[in-house]
Curated annotation (Swiss-Prot):
The protein's name in its UniProt record: Phosphatidate phosphatase LPIN3
Ranges spanned by the short sequence motif LXXIL motif, renumbered to the chain: 655-659
Entry-annotated residues carrying Phosphothreonine: T159
Region described as C-LIP: 590-792
Length: 851
């Protein structure tokens, strides 16, 4: 029994380690890189495909990847993208170079830059944007979630969990589903009352089609590539990561499902409300806890750690919705625009959809709904049920905290209004946490009235392109800055924005009032011009006019301001110097890249052969995560032998993934000694498999573990598919099209050696798909070998003849002549070899004489 128990414990531990390696939360890996030295001394390299696990909780300044080469740090860094992929950032040498929007990026966010606040300055602002709750409230939520777990289960986890599991658990604690759960209005109060910075900007430039992308005026964040927050329905592991497509030599992109041109809001589903540019934020429906921002019902699991829309189409989650407004504010906001309330609904792709007038403002979700109740735990509750709770039950979900968000009277009719504005005698300060909070316009008119019509404001609006072409627009006296529906001039708006950026705090209301009194021109405030003019002497007025006339001749602009009650012959002239006609400095443009230039490779001082490289990123929540790979330096005239892994080195595709991890040797007999003999003749080996990038460590460890007769497999770059685990398995096992990846990969490697001839000499595979891929890169059938699960080796040119790896090893000198002897006709032109061309013809035999 002890033996059985030890065996079961060993198997369980191995399976647990295997699952940990395949867990998407910690799935990281790096594909080996091949660098080819050219005749002229330059270098070419294959793409650097490096992927880290789910890092959606990282802030921008943490997404810097450090690189160590052969144990020494190098002056080269990468940046993390939206899906955990790493890429280099290259500054464009010329402004005329065209870069697709999907490849544009921001510079690497160094930790020492002043634009990125420290941890102590961030406070609750370090929470991602999607986590719409105060810092204390989020702590309370996590504590309540932990209290729902049995105590003995926590003790068991704390005892048996390794540091890697604890890191993965900490990551799942702060994963995207928790961030995207909407909160009631009271919980959003703290963020709505202060200017909170955004360290994570949802949605990257270049990931949206033109018809679905936001205009420059609608964005409140810099166009950064490394903060794309993507959520997709995960009803099955196969679709868990299938929404991201990552082809060889390219960056990952979102696999968008085809959507109809017009979207209709279905009954019983709440649509995401994204108001038009410049318009007020008026959601047409209130989104409860069971509806996601795209209007799709969400199944809430018992643990409360995952959100799954019912649809199977890949879905991109938008920014969190605004706090549901009261009926009074909705009517007032709609009235300002001259539109009836709830007359239109805006989908995420800015499609305007009419909503029936009889549609209720709040989606009805009864407690008796089977879909609603079957996912609720014993202590779970939907957010839209909170208003019906009494104060005692509400206190369970909103404990007292320093932020003052204790238990509220949800049952009172005026509770929501009091939660939104706990101090009605003070006007709430403007915030910058919504999409339409800030806009620029050259409409002017603040001297006449603070109320500028929306049509007039939009008619002279300033876009991002206008500001980049002429930054001097900020000095224009007609500039009007719109913040949360209120209009300010630049003298008032600049301190507000600067206070947010530098100190992450909003200016006090007293300071705002003082700025408005001193800096904001009012129509009734021009009286001081009159008494000032009464003190002017006649000679001073004439001197001022002469000075103004002289400056007008020099091309300077003047503006004449006069009040209604003054005489027309006594104007006051304010001198406004014109901007110098200089070309605004061009902002450097950066692009993503997966390859290094020849000069960058030369500075790495690579050794010939294998060079160990480690990619590491240090995060606040996960510590330091590392990915290991190898950079191989070859020459332009090296001859390469390609080898598949699954079914070629292993005996079968499926079991080749599993059995070696359980300690069983599942390798074909004789392949190790054959490959070793081929390597001794001067050939390089390249392993190409359609496995996912997350299995890089497992694959490399297996190839190093294989041994036969004291010989091990030759070292060589292991080229895997950069796509996700389930995408790679689906392509190889379900679709059975691994050649799609292999053709792209091998063609790219072939380009590194051109125009110096064909680098590939022979190839080993196990499927017709492998033969097809090898033919596409120019390999002749005489040097393409396939093996079946029984170990029978077949040469594609002579399919009727079957051999084995062991027999092929006996004639390796004939099929793989040593490269060290220099070029020969056998190697360069096999059709003119001694066997194919120069051999003596067979003598003619008369078959009749044999009878």
């Amino acid at each position: 029994m002890n033996y059985v128990g030890q065996l079961a414990e060993t198997v369980f531990g191995t399976v647990k380690e295997l699952y940990r390696g395949l867990n998407p939360a910690t799935l990281s890996g790096g594909i080996d890189v091949l660098v080819v030295k050219q005749v002229d001394g330059s270098f070419r390299c294959s793409p650097f495909h490096v992927r880290f696990g789910k890092l959606g909780v990282l802030r921008s300044r943490e997404k810097v990847v450090d690189i160590e080469l052969n144990g020494e740090p190098v002056d080269l860094h990468m940046k993390l993208g939206d899906s955990g992929e790493a890429f280099f950032v290259q500054e464009l040498e010329s402004d005329d170079e065209h870069v697709p929007p999907g490849l544009c990026t921001s510079p690497i966010p160094w930790g020492g830059l002043s634009g990125f606040p420290s941890d102590s300055q961030l406070g609750t602002a370090s929470e991602p944007e999607g986590l719409v709750m105060a810092g204390t409230a989020s702590t309370g939520r996590r504590k309540r979630r932990r209290r729902r777990k049995p105590k003995q289960k926590e003790d068991a986890v704390a005892t048996d969990s390794s540091p890697e599991e604890l890191e993965a658990g900490a990551e799942s604690e702060l994963s995207l589903p928790e961030k995207l759960r909407p909160e009631p209005p009271g919980v959003q109060l703290e963020e709505k009352s202060s200017l909170q910075p955004k360290d994570i900007y949802p949605y990257s430039d270049g990931e949206w089609p033109p018809q679905a992308s936001l205009s420059a005026g609608e964005l409140t964040s810099p166009k950064s590539d490394s903060e794309l927050e993507v959520r997709t329905p995960e009803p099955s592991p196969l679709r868990a990561e299938s929404h991201m497509q990552w082809a060889w030599g390219r960056l990952p992109k979102v696999a968008r499902a085809e959507r109809p041109e017009s979207s209709v809001v279905l009954e019983g589903r709440a649509g995401a409300t994204s108001p038009p540019r410049g318009g007020p934020s008026t959601p047409s429906t209130s989104v409860a806890g069971g509806v996601d921002p795209l209007g799709l019902p969400i199944q809430q699991t018992e643990a409360g750690a995952d959100l799954q829309p019912d649809t199977e189409d890949p879905t991109l989650v938008g920014p969190p919705l605004h706090t549901p407004e009261t009926e009074e504010s909705k009517t007032q906001s709609s009235g300002d625009m001259g539109l009836p309330p709830a007359s239109k609904s805006w989908s995420w792709a800015t499609l305007e959809v009419p909503v029936p007038t009889g549609q209720p403002e709040r989606v009805s979700r009864g407690k008796g709904s089977p879909k609603r109740s079957q996912h609720l735990g014993p202590s779970d509750i939907y957010l839209d049920d909170l208003p019906s709770l009494d104060s005692e039950n509400a206190a369970l979900y909103f404990p007292q905290s320093d932020s003052g968000l204790g238990a509220r009277r949800w049952s009172e009719p005026s509770s929501q209004k009091s939660l939104r504005d706990p101090n009605p005698e003070h006007e709430p300060e403007p915030t910058l946490d919504t999409v339409d909070t800030i806009a620029l316009s050259l409409c002017g008119g603040l001297a006449d009235s603070r109320d500028i019509s929306l049509e007039k404001f939009n008619q002279h609006s300033v876009s991002y392109q206008d500001l980049t072409k002429n930054p001097g627009l900020l000095d224009d006296p007609n500039l009007v800055v719109k913040i949360n529906g209120k209009h300010y001039n630049w003298a008032v708006a600049a301190p507000m924005i600067l206070s947010l950026q530098a100190f992450q705090k909003n200016l006090p209301k007293s300071t705002m009032d003082k700025l408005e009194r001193e800096k904001m021109p009012r129509k009734g405030g021009r009286w001081w011009f009159s008494w000032r003019r009464r003190d002017f002497l006649a000679e001073e007025r004439s001197a001022q006019k002469e000075k103004t006339a002289a400056k007008e001749q020099q091309g300077e602009k003047t503006e004449v301001l006069s009040s209604d009650d003054d005489a027309p012959d006594s104007p006051v002239i304010l001198e406004i110097p014109s901007l110098p006609p200089s070309t605004p400095p061009s902002t450097p443009t950066y692009k993503k890249s997966l390859r290094l230039s020849s000069d960058q490779i030369r500075r790495l001082n690579l050794q010939e052969g294998a060079n160990d490289v480690v990619f590491s990123v240090t995060t606040q929540y996960q510590g330091t995560c590392r990915c290991k790979a190898t950079i191989y330096l070859w020459k332009w005239d090296d001859k390469v032998v390609i080898s598949d892994i699954d079914g070629t080195i292993t005996k079968s595709d499926a079991l080749g993934h599993i059995l070696p991890q359980l300690g069983k040797d599942w390798t074909h007999q004789g392949i190790t000694s054959l490959y070793h003999k081929i390597q001794l003749n001067g050939y390089k080996f390249l392993y190409c498999s359609a496995r996912a990038i997350g299995m890089a460590d497992l694959t490399k460890g297996y190839l190093q573990w294989v041994s036969e007769g004291g010989c091990s497999l030759p070292k060589g770059p292991i080229l895997l598919s950069p796509s996700s685990l389930f995408s790679a398995l689906h392509r190889e096992v379900i679709e059975k099209k691994p050649e799609v990846f292999k053709v792209a990969c091998l063609s790219d490697i072939q380009q590194l050696f051109l125009p110096h001839g064909q680098p590939f000499y022979a190839a080993f595979g196990n499927r017709p798909n492998d033969v097809f891929a090898y033919r596409q890169v120019g390999l002749p059938e005489s040097r393409i070998f396939t093996v079946n699960p029984r170990g029978e080796l077949i040469q594609e040119l002579i399919k009727n003849h079957k051999s084995t790896y062991e027999r092929l090893g006996e004639v390796v000198e004939l099929l793989f002549p040593p490269v060290a002897r220099g070029p020969s006709t056998d190697l360069a032109n096999p059709e003119y070899s001694n066997f194919c061309y120069w051999r003596e013809p067979l003598p003619a035999v008369d078959l009749d004489t044999l009878d």
